[in-house]
Structures are given as C-alpha cells and as structure tokens.
C-alpha cells in the first residue's frame, strides 16, 4: 500500500509541472444556446479565507480511494470523462434523442465554460494552492482564477443532460459529480464554494438548453408505409424513419444538402460481386464497423495538442464535433428516407456481406457522412494533421464497400454530405471570438 501511495503521488507531482495555456478572453466568446457569457455571470464569491482550512483538512484525510479519484478526474479536459460516457450511450440509443443528448452535452459544457471564464476574470479569485502555500497541488495547474470550478461546471451539465435523457443513470451520474467535486478540493485546485457554484452553473445552463431544444426532436410518428418497387429498400422495421424531420442546429433544414437521387445500382452490384476480399480490406471493414472513430480521434488529438489543459478551447472542439454530428445525423437520415435506397444484399439476395447490414436504407452511407465531416472539421481544428483526417475519411467510407453493406455511390454521396455539413458549422463559428483561422492558438500546437 505504501509503494502504491508513493507511485500515485509521484505521478501527480510530475503532472502538475504541465502549465496550461489560459484563455483570458474566453468569457467573450459567442455561445450556442444562451445569449452570452456575461449575461449569466455569477454573483461575486465571499471570502475564501475560511475555506482554506477545509481544503487542508481534505488533503490531510486523503486515502487510497481519494487519490484514485484525483487521478481519474485529472485525465483530460473537464468534459473528457463525460464525453466518453455519452459516446457509448448515444450510439446505442434507438430513439432520435441520442444525437440530441450528445449535442447538448457539447454545447452546454461549452456555453457554461464561457460563462465560467467570464466569471473567473470578473472576480479573479486565486486557486487554493496560490492563496496558501500550505496547500499542495495534485492536478495540472490551470492558470486561471478559481471561481467557479470548471470541472464542476462540466459535471453539473453532464449529470443534468445524462440524467434527463437516460434517467436510469441519474443517480449514478450525480454520485460521479459529487466525487469529482470532492477530488478538485482535495487536489488543491478549487475551494468548496468554487465546486458548488460551478456545479449549479452547469446544471442551470443544461436545463436552459434542454428547454431551448425541447421541440428539436419530431413528435411525428412514422406512418409505417414502406415504398414498393425495384431498387427500393425492402426490409422490415426500419430504424430512425422520422429522424430527418428533426430540427437542425446549423443547417437551414435537414434537406439543405440533400444529394440527388441514387442511380440504378446494376454496375455497382457487379463491382461488389467481383471485389476480391483481402486480409487488409476485411480488417479495415471490421475496424470501422466496431469503433467510434470520430470520438476516439477527437479525444486523441485534444491530448496531443495539449488542449486538455485549455478548458475553453477543448470545450469548443467537443461542441463543434457534437453539433456537426447532430446535423450530419439528421441530414443523412433525411436523405435515406427521401430515397429508400436499396442495400446490396437486397438488390441481390444471393450476395452475402462481410458484416450484418444495418436496418435502414443505404443511400447515403452514415459512416461516410461522418467520415466526410471528420475530414473537414478536424482539419480545421488540427490543421497540421489534415492528411491523417483525409485518410481516415477515405478508409472509413471505403470500409462500408469492403464490408459489402454499401454501394460505392452511397459512400461518395455520404462523404460529400458530411463535408458540406462541417463546412457550414465552421462558417458559423468563424467569428465566435475563438477562431484565428487555424482553430488553434500557437501555444497549443503539437510539438
């Protein structure tokens, strides 16, 4: 046990040498679903001097479980652990609500972080380890004022959003939030009042954004009418048949970039029949069929570019991705159910794909749509890695052909749709106050 404690403390002491780049003007950045950061500025905090004893007491009482919580919540940006959770939840949600839940987690954490940064620099409350040299610091030093706690802001948002859309998890996420807040106090980076204020701020912004988007998901029920005829999808119980009726966030409508009708797939069916599967092609097909590539890649790049040490800019990246995913989902399913494009194993019932065919029309490909979005949006956020994102888009789209569940035209149309959606999102935030034509501050570039 003693060796374990020594190792944990050494890891924490190494980590705190990392200096985060702050964004002192982030409180002025434009927000998504609230008017501005300034309009929601918190009231001034009371004196922190009486709270120093509480921080010291927490540190003196740290046990193994407390150390583990500090390490767990030190990882990534304030929203990192919550985005990891929602990534798994929304992609397995069978309603139209999953994509909205994912989007709101991104926009609400970002908007609440903007409010937090406005409040921080309005009052300039010092961090506990700055206010009193007896306080040790066991977390990366975020060079920004203490009030309110940015991790607690994200926790307030996440517990509210996840609890609302996935009510069975409400108790669990609230307990997680409590442990998070306790860990920030014990780590010496927040006073108890910082965590309480941050949590309540996050909760308030989340509730407001849930209310603002309450009519985004369509209430219209599917009429259960399946089209008939050659070249038309002919499965049973299609998933998300009304998703294209939902409101979009950036696009003027779900059909704004709807591709033209699909061609006759006779030649493309021949291409699939004649395709010679290799170890590499099957590996690519299985990889993209089983991984949430977009989410994993975004987490990775945020770490590589040290944006996890820059809470406002990390929150912005997560929000841009969440909004883009949401509009891509709506636009893609608008097109799917506008055309009811047939799948290869329906066009030729003797054809057997490598992976199971999803239960909805094929044109355009959802994977390809998300791949096109990744290529454009991530290249904006992390421009030096543009070639990586181009390859991911190409491989991701091609994987659906290699898997035998999409015609090539499905993928080409999807890539183009995703690129257009991402471009529209980027255009919207070009003047948000954070953009500097590259999406990154020079200090945060990967070395």
Language-model features: locations:
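Acidic/polar surface patches and capping/hinge elements
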Residues: 21-447
């Amino acid at each position: 046990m003693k060796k374990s404690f020594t190792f944990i403390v050494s890891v924490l002491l190494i980590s705190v040498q990392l200096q985060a780049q702050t964004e002192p003007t982030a409180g002025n950045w434009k927000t998504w679903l609230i008017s501005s950061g300034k309009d929601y500025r918190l009231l001034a905090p009371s004196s922190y001097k009486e709270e120093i004893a509480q921080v010291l007491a927490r540190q003196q009482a740290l046990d193994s479980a407390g150390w583990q919580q500090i390490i767990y919540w030190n990882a990534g940006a304030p929203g990192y652990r919550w985005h990891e959770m929602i990534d798994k939840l929304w992609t397995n949600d069978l309603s139209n609500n999953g994509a909205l839940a994912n989007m709101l987690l991104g926009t609400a954490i970002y908007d609440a972080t903007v409010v937090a940064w406005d409040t921080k620099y309005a009052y300039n409350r010092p961090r506990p380890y700055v206010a009193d040299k007896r306080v040790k610091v066991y977390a990366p030093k975020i060079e920004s004022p203490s009030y309110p706690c940015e991790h607690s802001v994200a926790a307030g948002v996440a517990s509210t959003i996840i609890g609302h859309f996935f009510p069975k998890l409400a108790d669990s996420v609230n307990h997680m939030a409590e442990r998070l807040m306790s860990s920030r106090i014990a780590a010496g980076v927040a006073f108890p009042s910082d965590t309480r204020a941050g949590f309540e701020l996050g909760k308030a912004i989340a509730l407001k954004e849930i209310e603002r988007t309450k009519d985004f998901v369509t209430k219209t029920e599917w009429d259960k009418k399946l089209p008939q005829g050659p070249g038309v999808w002919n499965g049973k119980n299609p998933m998300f048949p009304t998703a294209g009726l939902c409101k979009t966030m950036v696009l003027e409508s779900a059909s704004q970039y709807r591709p033209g009708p699909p061609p006759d797939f006779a030649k493309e069916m021949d291409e699939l029949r004649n395709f010679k599967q290799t170890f590499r092609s099957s590996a690519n097909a299985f990889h993209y069929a089983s991984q949430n590539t977009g989410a994993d890649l975004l987490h990775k790049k945020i770490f590589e570019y040290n944006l996890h040490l820059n809470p406002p800019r990390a929150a912005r990246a997560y929000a841009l991705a969440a909004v883009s995913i949401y509009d891509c989902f709506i636009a893609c399913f608008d097109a799917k159910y506008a055309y009811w494009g047939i799948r290869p194993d329906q066009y030729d019932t003797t054809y057997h794909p490598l992976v199971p065919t999803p239960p909805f029309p094929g044109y355009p490909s959802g994977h390809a749509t998300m791949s096109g979005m990744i290529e454009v949006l991530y290249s904006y956020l992390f421009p030096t890695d543009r070639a990586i994102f181009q390859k991911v888009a190409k491989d991701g789209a091609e994987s659906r052909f290699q898997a035998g569940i999409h015609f090539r035209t499905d993928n080409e149309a999807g890539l183009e749709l995703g690129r257009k959606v991402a471009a529209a999102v980027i255009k919207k935030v070009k003047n948000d106050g954070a953009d500097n034509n590259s999406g990154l501050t020079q200090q945060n570039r990967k070395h």
